[in-house]
Amino acid sequence: MRFLNDLQPSFDLTYNDVFMVPARSSVTSRLDVNLSTNDGVGTTLPLVVSNMTAVSGRRMAETVARRGGIAILPQDIPLDIVRSAVERIKAAHTVYDTPVSVSPSTTIGEALSLMPKRSHGAVVVVENGKPLGIVTSRDGAEIDRFAQVHEVMSGDMLALNAGDDPQSMFNAMTERHLDFAPVLDDGKLIGVITRKGALRSTIYQPAVDPDGRLEVGAAVGINGDARGKAGELLRMGIDVLVVDTAHGHQEKMLETLPLVRDVRDAFADDTGRRIPIAAGNVVGTAGTQDLVAAGTDIVKVGVGPGAMCTTRMMTGVGRPQFSAVLECATAAHEAGAHVWADGGIRYPRDVALALAAGATSVMIGSWFAGTHESPGDLQTGADGRPYKESFGMASARAISNRTRDATGFERARMALFQEGISSSRMYLDPDRPGVEDLIDTITAGVRSSATYAGAHTIAEFHERAIIGLQSSAGYDEGRPLHASW
């Protein structure tokens, strides 16, 4: 990457402060752009779901991995819950969505409460592994909530065979004017697919481990037995290990990282597979160099740019994210490491600019919180708009969850030191209510950015990108108008 006219900025920059200049290009199609990463994680999209309790869980992890990204399970989740989640993610199908399934005697009320867990908006009625019918929200409208699903289900359903190719599945659903169908293998339900899902399976490549299973990562903090927890997570089968704290350039992190690295290396000697370590967060050269020297493969970059984070307003500490990513990526590349840009992502352009600055992948949190796949319950505001609650990982709410085993006095003391929002409404976009819808939007933007730069890969994109500086008026000029002026 270079700045337009070789200008060297005299101040630090956010994503809004910069733009990319189009260059001569031989890339004729967005689909000619390969967005696979080279940081050793194995993702085919440069998207990482942040290790936030309100964002990353089992549903999110399997859905994102199916499209090529990876989710990081938060460090606050008990290990037995993490183990169960990893097992279920690894068992999930790499192409077909996991169905929301109920028994024939399930009540309408319970079935309707389960539908928002997935974006396909239906449940499959199953008995002895075989689907009997489908229930949608329309089927349950104005029906007694204690009625049973077998009374209202649609038994005349289209069932697709696992061996069918995506195009034939799409055509079969289109002919029947359906958006959703169960997929069977030898008569047994193994998943469901939508028309969009059939299309996506021809565009995206899932992020899978050497055994062909969906990938998932997990985080550990720097307090407590980080070494022991890291070993447990590795044995569970995670695909990237994140060592995470808000201030990554501190002695405790630099003491913990070598311990985690040693556990990882011993695991690699035993299994033949070297799991990448990501650590952070930092915002400059010195922090990046120290983390790489201590044993990380990937440096997480960002202090305070996230929507749920109040660090900059509370402390004055942080750095505009574009400049932080640019400097850290330069230092990491010189040391043979990589960076993830963590925070401040609000539009597809921000993802593209982070990659142009040298990030291998981009971490997204709050933007993905407002989707069906995030862990929270779907709620409805007074205006009728559906939303999910989100909160920061240094907020009083997160601290309370993290310190549940401490005494009441200690928990009250720690709650005084919060840096994050404890409750924020993240509204579902009516046009993009599922995380896959957002992934479609992001990848379309990033692929198009690469074609403007004449790049076929992320590495070429970083090499060829030409970045200019703009005023706030310049940024506003590029915003679309949804009504006339």
Place the predicted regions along the sequence by residue.
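Catalytic beta/alpha-barrel core
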Residues: 72-76, 101-102, 122-124, 159-161, ...
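Catalytic cores of alpha/beta
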Residues: 59-61, 227-236, 283-301, 341, ...
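Glycine-rich phosphate-binding active-site loops on the catalytic face of alpha/beta enzymes
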Residues: 66-81, 238-250, 297-315, 345-378
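Active-site-adjacent beta->alpha loops and helix N-cap segments on the catalytic face
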Residues: 29-31, 77-87, 146, 190-207, ...
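Alpha/beta catalytic cores of nucleotide-metabolism and tRNA/nucleoside-modifying enzymes
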Residues: 1-24, 102, 161, 171, ...
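Short, ordered loop/turn segments at secondary-structure junctions
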Residues: 75-78, 128-129, 136-140, 165, ...
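Short beta-strand/loop segments at the ligand-binding rim of alpha/beta enzyme cores
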Residues: 43-49, 95-98, 210-219, 260-283, ...
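Bateman/CBS regulatory modules and CBS-like beta-alpha motifs in cytosolic regions of diverse proteins
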Residues: 24, 29-44, 48-52, 81-118, ...
